[in-house]
Design a protein with these regions (language model features):
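The short loop immediately C-terminal to the conserved phospho-acceptor aspartate in CheY-like receiver
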Residues: 91, 96-98
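Non-catalytic signal-transmission and effector/linker regions of two-component phosphorelay proteins
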Residues: 1-64, 72, 79-84, 89, ...
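Alpha4 helix (beta4-alpha4-beta5 surface) of REC/receiver domains from two-component response regulators
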Residues: 86, 101-113, 124-147, 153, ...
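Short amphipathic alpha-helix used as the core "switch/output" element in two-component signaling
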Residues: 34, 69-82, 102-117, 134-137
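Hydrophobic/aromatic residues positioned on beta-strands within the core alpha/beta folds
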Residues: 93, 120-124
């Protein structure tokens, strides 16, 4: 039996980055949309030094990244994506984004527009505990917290897992 799904290209998944710092957007772009050839070279070198076989390539995330630098801008993008029937599957949202609304308010209003979007809230600070965040947002099954500075592997793993989870819903 021919498995056609294996030969079809993976659909592009839409990920929204919401952060007031342009450098953070570039970091996400490097992590989530990277050419993995340098990672393959590192894996090969590691296997030569430490023994064993190099691990396979990172999964093809097939991601379209869209940037918003303030909460209100993010909400406009989410509204348009829903209206165009091309919603975001995942958003990485910073907590502090002066001078506008913060990440908690952004996420709350984002879920009013699109309750299916998966969210990773990102912060370098301890403004809110998990309990406060969960209580405030009331949708913790679609929420993960990522502490800055973030680890490349953790960001990719979160993206892979949450995008797969979105496809199951």
């Amino acid at each position: 039996m021919l498995n056609i799904s294996k030969s079809l290209p993976r659909p592009v998944r839409r990920v929204l980055i919401v952060d007031d710092n342009p450098a953070i957007h570039e970091d996400y772009r490097r992590v989530l949309c990277a050419d993995d050839s340098h990672l393959d070279n590192l894996a090969s070198t590691k296997s030569l030094l430490l023994g064993g076989q190099p691990s396979g390539k990172s999964p093809d995330l097939s991601i379209e990244l869209v940037s918003a630098f303030q909460g209100e801008e993010a909400l406009d993008l989410v509204r348009r994506s829903v209206a165009d029937n091309n919603p975001f599957q995942l958003a990485f949202v910073d907590v502090r984004m002066p001078p506008g609304i913060d990440g908690i308010e952004t996420i709350s209003r984002m879920w009013d527009i699109d309750p299916d979007i998966q969210v990773v809230i990102c912060t370098a600070f301890s403004d809110y505990s998990w309990e406060e965040t969960s209580e405030s947002l009331q949708n913790s099954d679609k929420l993960l917290i990522l502490k800055k500075p973030f680890d490349i592997t953790v960001v990719r793993q979160m993206a892979c897992s949450l995008l797969a989870k979105f496809e199951l819903t």
